[in-house]
Curated annotation (Swiss-Prot):
It comes from the Viruses. Keywords: Capsid protein, Helical capsid protein, Ribonucleoprotein, Virion. It is found in: Virion. Belongs to the potexviruses coat protein family. GO terms for molecular function: structural molecule activity. This is Capsid protein. InterPro entries: Carlavirus_coat_N, Pltvir_coat. Required for genome encapsidation. Forms ribonucleoprotein complexes along with TGB1 helicase and viral RNA. Residues 1-60 are annotated as: Disordered. Residues 29-47 have a biased composition (Basic and acidic residues).
Amino acid sequence: MPPKPAPGDNEGNASGSTPTPPPPPPARTAEEARLRLAEMEREREQEQLLEEMNSNTPAEDARNISRLTQLAALLRREQTNVHVTNMALEIGRPALQPPPNMRGDPTNMYSQVSSDFLWKIKPQRISNNMATSEDMVKIQVALEGLGVPTESVKEVIIRLVLNCANTSSSVYQDPKGVIEWDGGAIIADDVVGVITKHSTLRKVCRLYAAVAWNYMHLQQTPPSDWSAMGFHPNVKYAAFDFFDYVENGAAIRPSGGIVPKPTRAEYVAYNTYKMLALNKANNNDTFGNFDSAITGGRQGPAIHNNLNNANNKTL
């Protein structure tokens, strides 16, 4: 049997692997050692350069593309044309959780009331000076009983309110004419009679004051008697006797809101005429009894107001 080849022998490397080169002999001088070190550094730099050039493998490219795609998606999510400023949200915030000793006791009348408790109570716009929802339902059913179609009841009431804006909403007025709708008509006296049975004409007119206000401006038709009532042309749209309820929160508002908003001059003109009208109508209120022994068969004296104390000084 032939002997085995010694390690490092050429015959033992028949597999084709490259034999490991023998280590260089030790440097004899310091200068030779520095030269060898510099050569080793150059070889290391060349190997790193080759590795960097060959690093863009398909797997590395796929990772880079995935990272770029994720970055682009992130930038798109952060991109927006809306920027909210002055952020302050009170509605929808998480409810506070006070400790047990500070929680409200609903059985104790003197328990402190929190802001969250008050927020749960939704406001209701209520006025005792205009017709209530129950009054309006009674009026609707009564008008239906007279033959007014259900879908025309609102139109009949609004038409009557618009007529009252031109005349008066007083219970003592004598309504004239008819109230028409598509396919029928009803005498105005019957409508007023039904309203006064369940409420008052003025309360119903106050309920629709904002509707009448918008209608007059939309059609550019102020109340007919504005000039006879002494109103200036600049405030002529305020010349109806339920103008003071246009901005009342309990009144029925048009879907587009109140347009235009009543001015301060219109309120001054209206309240001035209201004072004069009430003084003229209440002259008999000075009598404690209407017996002829007291009144002497005469109307009461005119009521006069001293307006000399009004602040008419210029600033």
